[in-house]
Amino acid sequence: MFAKGKGSAVPSDGQAREKLALYVYEYLLHVGAQKSAQTFLSEIRWEKNITLGEPPGFLHSWWCVFWDLYCAAPERRDTCEHSSEAKAFHDYSAAAAPSPVLGNIPPNDGMPGGPIPPGFFQPFMSPRYAGGPRPPIRMGNQPPGGVPGTQPLMPNSMDPTRQQGHPNMGGSMQRMNPPRGMGPMGPGPQNYGSGMRPPPNSLGPAMPGINMGPGAGRPWPNPNSANSIPYSSSSPGTYVGPPGGGGPPGTPIMPSPADSTNSSDNIYTMINPVPPGGSRSNFPMGPGSDGPMGGMGGMEPHHMNGSLGSGDINGLPKNSPNNISGISNPPGTPRDDGELGGNFLHSFQNDNYSPSMTMSV
């Protein structure tokens, strides 16, 4: 109502009350209520001199103008009487200078009825007020406007759907060198792509995203086919990985004796977690004459898919990798494509298998 600034005096509430009391007394005198006017002054203990204005007085004139404009508002002009000047005032004000925030919204509650879109108050609040709303943060290729649900919030470098890797492997798990002691991993580091798909749920949480391409670049079998063997790690974190020497999927990595020089780090650390308070010094899998994986010849059938127990493995006889029981192809030997459609593992109940050759769990 009053312009606030250093050069202009702002009237206090006391001055406003005095003005209003003067206008009320003036109104009562102009309408002929002299006794009411004197009683009013005595009850409010008015002691100053009063100078009356011309009739009908400021209060009456101000009220008439307000009421005319109130009745000429667009939502009431059809039901209330008003002057043409008041109607023209509303029409001109709405067409010439609409409100930048609310526009021509009817003054019900001062706010629109529907939800306010993102960034509604941003263009005119952020430059002036330091505490105004900040623009929404966009990530990646999200379009401006901050409307959720239009684009994924992850940039291209973090979007797993844009990688060539497995869908269950995040974008950050793409290029990792295989650990030492794992034997030959195929022709160099490879990503899962170009036709090579690992079976679903085959990578446990303890071995995320190791780039172990299959031997000789052969494609993985389709996990959706009916003849594929579903081998998933029933014990998380203990899956060894895909075959290293061209063997069928589901067989542990078993390097040939010629590659035993690369086994300075025991592969047992990759397939058997350390039990609480225990040790794993009794596992006979160091580099020797039978190769680093020579003691895995007599594993039980349920241990051949990488789901090893959490305890130590004791007392396994050392066999040559070429004499492994229950595997259709020894590691390093080629196989026919026709094997992909049949059963990869022979029956494990043969002469070379006995209950005494199982792992202690």
Swiss-Prot record:
GO cellular component: nucleus; protein-containing complex; transcription regulator complex
InterPro entries, per the entry: LisH (IPR006594), SSDP_DNA-bd (IPR008116)
Compositional bias ranges of the Pro residues kind: 245-255
Residues bearing the modification Phosphoserine: S320, S325, S328, S354, S360
Gene Ontology annotations of biological process type: head development; head morphogenesis; hematopoietic progenitor cell differentiation; mesendoderm development; midbrain-hindbrain boundary initiation; positive regulation of anterior head development; positive regulation of cell population proliferation; positive regulation of DNA-templated transcription
Localisation per UniProt entry: Nucleus
Matches recorded under PROSITE patterns: LISH (PS50896)
A Pfam family hit: SSDP
Residue list for modification Phosphothreonine: T333
Keyword tRNA processing: no
Biased composition (Gly residues): 288-298
N-acetylmethionine modification, residue list: M1
Biased composition (Polar residues): 258-269, 346-361
Any GO MF annotation of the entry: single-stranded DNA binding
Domain of life: Eukaryota
Biased composition (Low complexity): 223-241, 319-330
Positions bearing Asymmetric dimethylarginine: R128, R134, R138
Job description of the protein: May be involved in transcription regulation of the alpha 2(I) collagen gene where it binds to the single-stranded polypyrimidine sequences in the promoter region.
PANTHER family per record: SINGLE STRANDED DNA BINDING PROTEIN (PTHR12610), SINGLE-STRANDED DNA-BINDING PROTEIN 3 (PTHR12610:SF22)
UniProt name for this protein: Single-stranded DNA-binding protein 3
